[in-house]
Design a protein with these regions (language model features):
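Loop-to-transmembrane helix boundary motifs in multi-pass membrane proteins
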Residues: 6, 12-14, 20, 142, ...
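Select transmembrane alpha-helical segments in multipass membrane proteins
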Residues: 6-17, 42-45, 85-98, 146-152, ...
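Transmembrane helix-boundary motif of multi-pass solute transporters/channels
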Residues: 11-49, 236-242, 252-256, 260-261, ...
Length: 493
């Protein structure tokens, strides 16, 4: 059997894994949600949930990878006790990875397109209405969207094609270091804009009055959800890099480093965006309109705005591409582990698959805009995003946690032994009851709340049918967890 690839350095593992976690959500959502929920008051709650929720699930995912030395194609098969059906849950992983890439590659293409347009001066002299028109024209042109999505796909599969150490690790190291340097430069520039101090105050000074106004429960749930979704946990994109990790370091310490990097990027994004909005009297928003309409308009009004706009979208391109590369590797490993394929064959086949599968999201903004699967105003990308973010990420996370703690899964003792192999921060034994009961409950609450938020404003029939579907999926997960196989702790193989 061919020897498993390994990272060339510890830094490579940390930067590649952090690159997977760091995505566009760090930029187009975190600063806005921090500001409206009381600044530093929200950040404090967010950090608590990162440690209590995101970190242990990430440790579970990495540990399954390192313990099995396999991607999700065979990881659960390798570690599960005989007679159990945990391995069937691997399809959550591969389905989630493909579904995510069906729209994320398109959004990555948007970033590359905007970096190109900023660099070539497309936005120079345009007002907000004209910039909005540029974005609208891009969305209505399927040829443009397809071309830039393919550029993102080619770059990402190109990195994966050279293997772990010579391709993914080398390329992602360069991108992540450049990303961090670009962020610092952009944040320093924002800090010296007029009225920047007011923006920083809005962003960071604790405002418990805003928390009370928005509702403490709403603020807590917003912090909980952001902490959960920011780390890209649940579909195996972290697990695959755990399978390439040696046993010199304990996994908890490595996961802490990745969480810290992700948090740093999220916080720095606020230092870039919020002062810019305050400097030009614009309400800080979130989502695509912030990135593709508001910010290009503001860069036009800024001294050296064309340069800063170009640097910003290069930074955003790196954030998107680092995630795409990581998820592509998880997809490739699935085919290599399951089918025994070589890397080149896996790259070739999946290049075609991803390119074709990205077309519905692209056409959903133009040719197929009449298809509105989640109600009026929605599009195909919204549906794909909902299936990933509100379904497969929480359900996949639930599988990882239950598999690691239940006796008819891998078992907590086996999980703990593998997680604590090496030097560094130990994963505590006393956390067992929390992992078995409270953590799964929190994930279930996040999962069901996502459905409630999506469909509570729809018709009663739509709301009831989708909520029943959500509960049915939970029964499937817990059915495998509780009733599958013999009650015998799995062994590390």
């Amino acid at each position: 059997m061919k020897e498993r690839e390994k990272f060339g350095s510890r830094l490579g593992f940390i930067l590649v894994s952090a690159g997977c976690a760091i995505g566009i959500g760090n930029v187009w959502k975190f600063p806005y949600i921090t500001g409206i929920y009381g600044g530093a008051a929200f950040i404090l709650m967010y950090l608590v949930f990162l440690v209590a929720l995101g970190l242990p699930i990430m440790v579970c995912e990495f540990t399954v990878g390192r313990g099995s030395r396999m991607g999700m194609g065979k990881a659960l098969d390798t570690l599960e006790p005989k007679g159990t059906k945990w391995h069937r849950m691997k399809w959550i992983s591969i389905f989630g990875s493909f579904l995510l890439m069906m729209f994320y590659t398109m959004v990555g293409g948007w970033m590359l397109k905007y970096a190109f347009m900023e660099a070539t001066g497309t936005f120079v002299g345009l007002d907000g209405k004209a910039v909005e028109g540029v974005f609208g024209d891009m969305l209505t042109n399927p040829g443009t969207l397809t071309f830039w999505a393919i550029v993102a796909i080619v770059i990402s599969f190109g990195a994966c094609g050279f293997g772990l150490e010579k391709g993914i690790e080398k390329v992602t190291k360069v991108m992540m270091i450049a990303l961090l340097l670009l962020m610092i430069a952009l944040a320093v520039n924002s800090a010296f804009l007029p009225n920047a101090a007011a923006g920083i105050k809005f962003y960071l000074v604790p405002d418990f009055g805003e928390v009370a106004k928005k509702g403490f429960g709403n603020a807590v749930f917003a912090a909980m959800s952001q902490a959960f979704f920011t780390l890209s946990i649940g579909i195996g994109s972290m697990e695959i890099f755990g399978s390439y990790l040696d046993r010199k370091k304990r996994i908890t310490g490595e996961a802490v480093n990745i969480v810290l990097l992700d948090t740093f990027v999220a916080l720095m994004a606020g230092f870039i965006i919020i002062p810019v909005c305050f400097a030009y009297g614009v309400e800080p928003g979130s989502g695509p309109s912030l990135l593709f309409i508001t910010l290009p308009t503001l860069f036009n009004n800024m001294a050296g705005g064309r340069i800063w706009g170009t640097l910003f979208f290069i930074f955003m391109s790196f954030a998107a591409l680092s995630t795409i590369i990581a998820v592509f590797e998880e997809i490739l490993a699935f085919f290599m582990d399951i089918g025994g394929w070589g890397r080149k064959k896996a790259v070739g086949v999946n290049f075609v698959l991803i390119t074709v599968l990205s077309l519905p999201a692209i056409l959903g903004f133009n040719v197929l805009s009449g298809i509105q699967p989640l109600g009026e105003g929605s599009n195909i990308m919204d549906m794909e995003d909902f299936l990933v973010s509100s379904n497969l990420l929480p359900l996949g996370s639930l599988v990882f946690v239950l598999f690691c703690v239940r006796k008819n899964g891998w078992g907590f003792e086996n999980f703990l032994k593998e997680a604590n192999e090496g030097e560094g921060i130990k994963f505590p034994h006393w956390i067992r009851l929390y992992m078995q009961y409270i953590l799964p409950l929190i994930v279930v609450i996040i999962y069901l709340k996502g459905y409630y938020d999506m469909f509570s404003g729809k018709s009663t029939a739509m709301f009831v049918s989708w909520m029943c579907f959500a509960v049915l999926l939970l029964f499937v997960i817990f059915g495998v967890s509780i009733f599958t196989g013999r009650k015998k702790t799995g062994k590390v193989k």
